[in-house]
From Swiss-Prot:
It catalyses: (2R)-3-phosphoglycerate + ATP = (2R)-3-phospho-glyceroyl phosphate + ADP. The lineage of its organism: Bacteria, Pseudomonadati, Pseudomonadota, Gammaproteobacteria, Oceanospirillales. GO terms for molecular function: ADP binding; ATP binding; phosphoglycerate kinase activity. This is Phosphoglycerate kinase. Belongs to the phosphoglycerate kinase family. Substrate binds at residues 21-23, 36, 59-62, 114, 147.
C-alpha cells in the first residue's frame, strides 16, 4: 500500500500542518544537539518555499499531560529554528482554536503537543481540533510513527488531506529497500545488552538475512548457548534454547577471540584472549581483533547491511575497537547500508562514518518495530487515507 507524498502536492496558499520529531536535548534553555532539527529542516523549508502557511508541531520530553511546564517548552527549539532560518519563528501557546496568523511562506511553531489533554490517548476531539487547523497534514516524524497519538495518528484520520513528508517517505523507502527486497548477501548486525529486548528483531531478521552478526550481551547468550564459557559477563541463561533455535535458522558467526576485563569501568584493564580461555571472573566487553577482522571481511562482501547496536562497550575506548572496525568496514563496503538505534548513532558519530552510511534512521523504537515487521499506526493511517 502506498501513501500520498507531500512532494506530490501543490502547497501554495494552503494551511500545512507538519508533525516533526523535534524532541531534542535542551540544557539551560539551549538546544545541545540539533540533529533532529537539521533532519526536519528541508521539509519545513520546502513547504515555506512553495508558499504554504506552515505550522509545525512536536513533543519535547515527557511533561505531565495537560500541564504547561517551562522545562518542556518548545521555546528553545523555536529560538534555534529562528537562528537556522535567519528570521523569527514565533512559538504559539494557545493554538487549538486557530487564534493566530501565518502568512504564505511563513512559519509558526506550536507549543509542545504533550501539553494538550488527550494527546497520548489519541483523543478524537483533540485530533479533530488539530485537523481543523489545516488543509494538508504532513506526517514527517518517523521516530513517533509507532505510537498512535492525536498528533501522529488521529489528526491524519480527520485532516482534509494526510500525507508523508520527505523525511518519513525516505525512511520508509530505505527500510523497504533493506527488508523487502534486499540485494544479497544481506548481513545484519544486532547488538545490545539483552536478547529478551531484541528477540522479535532477531527472529524477524533470521528469516531475511544471510548472516546475522550478534554483539554485546546478546553475543554472550549465543556464546553460552554454543557451550562457551562467558565468565561473569552479561548473559541470559534462561534464553539459551531460544538462542539455539535462532542459530538453527541463520548463520551466526560467533567471535573466536574476545576482549575481557575483571570489572566494568572506564579504567578497567583490557585483555585480549581466545574464547576458550575466558575464566570465571572475566567479563567479555568487546569482540577481539581476529573476530573483528573476519567480520569486517564479511561486511565488505555484503550487498545489504542493517546495523543496530555496537558490538562492544565502545564508550570506554579500550573496548571500542570491535565496533570501530565494523563501522569502518560498513563505511568501506559498496553495500546499501542502513543504521538505526540510539547507541548505533552515537558510535557512528564517534568513529566519523556518517557520510559513508547509505541511510541513518532517525527512529529508535519505530526503527526496531519496522524491522520486526510490525505495523506502524501513523503509517497505516496514511496508507488508509491514500486508498480512499
Amino acid at each position: 500500500m502506498s501513501v500520498i507524498k507531500m512532494t506530490d502536492l501543490d502547497l501554495r496558499g494552503k494551511r500545512v500542518l507538519i508533525r516533526e520529531d523535534l524532541n531534542v536535548p535542551v540544557k539551560n534553555g539551549k538546544v545541545t544537539s540539533d540533529a533532529r532539527i537539521q533532519a526536519a529542516l528541508p521539509t519545513i523549508k520546502l513547504a515555506m518555499e512553495q508558499g504554504a502557511k506552515v505550522m509545525v508541531m512536536s513533543h519535547l520530553g515527557r511533561p505531565e499531560e495537560g500541564q504547561f511546564s517551562e522545562e518542556n517548552s518548545m521555546q528553545p527549539v523555536g529560538a534555534h529554528l529562528s537562528s537556522l532560518l535567519g528570521h523569527d519563528v514565533p512559538v504559539v501557546r494557545d493554538y487549538l482554536d486557530g487564534d493566530f496568523e501565518v502568512e504564505e511562506g511563513g512559519l509558526v511553531l506550536f507549543e509542545n503537543v504533550r501539553f494538550n489533554v488527550g494527546e497520548g490517548k489519541d483523543n478524537e476531539e483533540l485530533s479533530k481540533k488539530y485537523a481543523a487547523l489545516c488543509d494538508i497534514f504532513v506526517m514527517d516524524a518517523f521516530g513517533t510513527a509507532h505510537r498512535a497519538q492525536a498528533s501522529t495518528h488521529g489528526v491524519a484520520k480527520f485532516a482534509p488531506v494526510a500525507c508523508a513528508g520527505p523525511l518519513l517517505a525516505a525512511e520508509l523507502e530505505a527500510l523497504g529497500q533493506a527488508l523487502d527486497k534486499p540485494q544479497r548477501p544481506m548481513v545484519a548486525i544486532v547488538a545490545g545488552s539483552k536478547v529478551s529486548t531484541k528477540l522479535d528483531v532477531l527472529n524477524s531478521l533470521s528469516e531475511v538475512c544471510d548472516q546475522l552478526i550478534v554483539g554485546g550481551g546478546i553475543a554472550n547468550t549465543f556464546l553460552a548457548a554454543a557451550d562457551h564459557k562467558v565468565g561473569k559477563s552479561l548473559c541470559e541463561m534462561d534464553l539459551l534454547d531460544t538462542a539455539r533455535s535462532i542459530a538453527a535458522k541463520v548463520q551466526i558467526p560467533l567471535p573466536t577471540d574476545v576482549v575481557t576485563a575483571k570489572a566494568f569501568s572506564e579504567s578497567a584493564e583490557a585483555s585480549v584472549k581466545p574464547i576458550a580461555e575466558v575464566t570465571d571472573d572475566d567479563m567479555i566487553l568487546d569482540i577481539g581483533p581476529q573476530s573483528a577482522a573476519a567480520l569486517a571481511e564479511l561486511l565488505k562482501s555484503a550487498k545489504t547491511i542493517l546495523w543496530n547496536g555496537p558490538v562492544g562497550v565502545f564508550e570506554f575506548d579500550q573496548f571500542g575497537d570491535g565496533t570501530k572496525t565494523l563501522a569502518q568496514a560498513i563505511a568501506e563496503s559498496d553495500a546499501f547500508s542502513i543504521a538505526g538505534g540510539g547507541d548505533t548513532l552515537a558510535a557512528i558519530d564517534k568513529y566519523g562514518v556518517s557520510e559513508k552510511i547509505s541511510y541513518i534512521s532517525t527512529g529508535g523504537g519505530a526503527f526496531l518495530e519496522f524491522v520486526e515487521g510490525k505495523t506502524l499506526p501513523a503509517v497505516a493511517m496514511l496508507q488508509k487515507r491514500a486508498a480512499e
